[in-house]
Every structure is written in structure tokens, then in C-alpha cells.
Amino acid sequence: MATLNHEGTISTFYGTVALRQAHAAAVSGDVITLSSGTFLSTDISKAVTIRGAGMDVTKVNDIVNEPTILSGNFNIKISAEDTGRLTLEGIYHNGNIIFSEGQVKNALFLKSRFKYISKSGSCKVQDLTVLNCRISESISVGSGNSAQLLNSVVNYFLDGYMSFSHCVILDSYYLFKDGNEYKSCIICRGGDFESGISSSSSAYNNLFISDKADLLQSVPNNTNLRVPTSDERFAYLRGYNDSKDYKLTDQNRDVLKATDGGEIGIYGGSLPYSAIPTNPQITKFNVASKTTADGKLSVDIEVKSGE
């Protein structure tokens, strides 16, 4: 089920095409809320908010019973004249998302699991924020465009000016990209083609799991730490899997502190990682099989607030 909120007026759509129908009826600024279940993806041409029930397909979260899954690739093509903000929250997507047309400004991807995010053509992507997300393959916003990633797990990244804070980056190959920023992250070895950090980038209080001795050659400060890939304390962090929580342990938590003196990685800082959506979730919905003697039907609903 999908509900569309347009200035307080609620419309409801059903079935796997519910998102497509809700988006077609929406205007910029509207809110589309999706229940748990699978929905066919739709190209997004309006700066709307799309909120799902959660991204957690592993069911380790006690609030999100079932995830909201979007099926199929989709494009984001929002006109430069659209001044609204696109927000995607609480969804699981295992296809390709392409910024393909127009200009996307200040978009927010929140508490979602994505596979592949990229840009094509002349589309401009300005100040994309990715918070409490998982990206199982890669993210790229294209040369000259920008994104900040906060408390998120990223398999690897490509083009664009990227700022990473309290992230886990699982493939460090593109560290050579110019102008990036890395703070309080855990950054793993980049396969057979590992590179050092660009001299035009900045890096503070990051843990690098790498055998490249000169990895930090261009970073003159002494706040970063490199440990070899043979260090068993961190072996479990390497490689992407939806079931991994990427938590530090009592054995390795104090090896390096973040810029704020707290924990590095996705559970540190002021926005620690959580898969729980911010919108309230229906966690129990029971309807009696028959009415009472006086014609009443018993309905038992339990709602837990989001974060």
C-alpha cells in the first residue's frame, strides 16, 4: 500500500504499482509513504519524500518487521526549476539508480540500502546527503558534483567530490581522487590496485586496513592509523554483506579514537548508524475473525515511534 499526502489530503494506492500511481499523482513537496512489501520502481521526476517501512532484510531489527523493497532500476530526473528536496528513506533497493536529467539539489538518502548509485549525461548533483545507509556496490555523483556520506557503509566510490564522516569504506582504490575528505572512518584495502590518498584531500582520525606502506604519504598529520590486512582484530570488517553490522568490538574499539574523542566507524559521532526509520511503524495489526454480539469488530494495532 502507498499513501500520498498532498497538503493534508490523503490518497491511497494498492498493489505492486502503488508507488508508480502515487508518484504520478504527486507534486513536488508531497509525501509518499510505503508499507512493507515489494513495489515496482518508478522514475522520479518530482522532489517528493518517499518513506518506506525499512531496509532491513535480515530481520535483526525489532521494530521493522518486513522491509520495503523497490524492484527494478530507476532514474532520477528532476527539473532545475524544482526547488524542493528529494528524500528517500527506509527502502531496500538492489538495482541501479541513475541521476539522469536536470539538477538534483540537497537530496537526502536516509536509512536505506542501495546497490548502485551513479550519474549520466548532463545531470547536476549538488550536495547529496547519504545518512545511515548501506551501498553494496558503488556510488558516484560525477565529476564536479558533490556528496557527503555520514555513518554509512560504502563498498566503494567513484567520481565526485566526496566527504566521508564515520563511514566504513570497503574498497579504498579511489582514494587517489582529488579534493575528498575522510574523518573518523574505517577504510579497507582496495584489492590489487590500491592507491594512496590524494595530496589535495584531507584525512583525520581514520583507520586504514592496508598493506600499502606509503598509503598516508600525502597526509602529513599524525591522526590516522594503518594496520596490516593480517591484523585479525579487523578481519571481520572486510567485504560487504547485508547481514554484517560492522560494529567494533571490545578488542579493537580503542585502537583509534574519532575526531570527537569517541568511536570511529558508523556507530560513532552524533548520528550513529541505525536501520530504524524516523517515521512511526505499525508493528502489530490484528483484526478479529468475527464481530461481537453487538456488531463491533475488534482491531488491535500497535505503533512504535521512529527515531
Task: Put a short name on every predicted segment.
Residues 36-38, 54-58, 208-215, 251-262:
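Acidic glycine-/aspartate-rich tracts in secreted/extracellular proteins
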Residues 48-100, 116:
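Right-handed parallel beta-helix/beta-spiral solenoid domain characteristic of secreted/periplasmic
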Residues 270-306:
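Surface beta-strand/loop "capping" patches
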Residues 221-277, 281:
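C-terminal accessory segments
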